[in-house]
Curated annotation (Swiss-Prot):
Protein name, UniProt field: Shikimate kinase
Pathways per UniProt: Metabolic intermediate biosynthesis; chorismate biosynthesis; chorismate from D-erythrose 4-phosphate and phosphoenolpyruvate: step 5/7
Cofactor dependence: Mg(2+)
Cited PROSITE patterns: SHIKIMATE_KINASE
The keyword Isomerase appears for this protein: no
High-level lineage: Bacteria, Bacillati, Actinomycetota, Actinomycetes, Pseudonocardiales
Length: 175
């Protein structure tokens, strides 16, 4: 069993929104590994970061991704930092991965000063977001089967493009 699509990207790219719409359109279940981590930890991600530290969160995230890839056959959305794990990137190598990219200005606008996004809650969220994009962009591209820019594109239009690609790959026997 493996997901029909795995959605990755930085914070604010629309992973959860697009993932839910995609699952609905394909008639499959949706799963978000951030939700899995919160359920297992019994507390929000921001509290895990502040109380336990980022390394503890990343270990929990890595386990959640591995479990979801093994158990879930619908659409799977991963946390923005999940690609930092070498193990996770290796597991994604054989998966249909959709990388939702977002530009600096749009990403900073979408994420703002959200305290729910602990890595972006600093003094200068735009500079923090740029550093995050610079560090992660090569990793997102490493795991991506497809890359779709989200700036100025409605979620439904993104889903249309993903459905076309997933359907074409299924027809060609590349699931």
């Amino acid at each position: 069993m493996s997901p029909c699509a795995v959605v990755v990207g930085p914070p604010g790219a629309g992973k959860t929104t697009v993932g839910r719409l995609l699952a609905e359109r394909l008639g499959v279940a949706f799963r978000d590994t951030d939700d899995d981590v919160v359920r297992v930890a019994g507390k929000p991600i921001a509290e895990i970061f502040t109380g336990d530290g980022e390394p503890v969160f990343r270990a929990m995230e890595e386990r959640a991704v591995a479990a979801a890839l093994a158990e879930h056959d619908g659409v799977l959305s991963l946390g923005g930092g999940s690609v930092l794990s070498e193990r996770t990137r290796a597991l994604l190598a054989e998966q249909p991965v959709v990388f939702l990219s977002v530009g600096l200005a749009e990403g900073a606008r979408r994420t703002g000063l959200s305290t729910a996004r602990p890595l972006l809650a600093g003094v200068n969220p735009r500079a923090t977001f740029k550093a995050l994009l610079d560090a992660r962009l090569p990793l997102y591209r490493e795991v991506a089967t497809w890359e779709l820019a989200t700036d100025g594109v409605e979620p439904d239009a993104l889903v249309d493009r993903i459905v076309e690609r997933v359907t074409a790959d299924r027809a060609a026997g590349r699931e």
